[in-house]
Regions:
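STAS-like cytosolic regulatory interaction modules
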Residues: 1-65, 71-119
């Protein structure tokens, strides 16, 4: 269960904390094959929402599988309108990868560089 302000996952490599305003997750550390299952599990807990906010300011590394999991949440499982996934404070290297693979233009995905107010 996701509770705002409470660290929902921390294995020493990656930490995910639920945020209240905007509602979603603040993610820090490394997203790789060892932390990917935990990321997907937390994203699935948010799947019922129309808008999901992910603050990536603390992400030091993210592999393609991790990025793809976040991008696929935009509209995943929806038969009509896509949900919005808002990525806040995306590190420059992740912005570059999103652009190279073309995921930055995914319908329903918003890349917002303004501070999200992680609380």
């Amino acid at each position: 269960m996701i509770v705002p302000g409470v660290v929902g996952y921390d294995d020493g490599a990656m930490r995910m904390t639920a945020t209240r305003n905007p509602p979603g997750l603040a993610i820090a550390g490394e997203i790789d094959e060892s932390t990917y299952p935990a990321l997907v599990a937390r994203l699935e807990e948010l799947a019922g929402r129309d808008e999901i906010h992910l603050n990536l300011a603390g992400v030091e590394y993210c592999d393609l599988a991790g990025l793809r999991a976040m991008v696929l949440m935009a509209g995943a499982g929806r038969s009509s309108d896509s949900r919005r996934v808002v990525l806040h404070e995306v590190p420059p290297q992740l912005q570059t990868v999103l652009g190279i693979v073309g995921w930055d233009s995914t319908p329903g995905l918003v890349i917002d560089q303004r501070p999200s107010g992680r609380g």
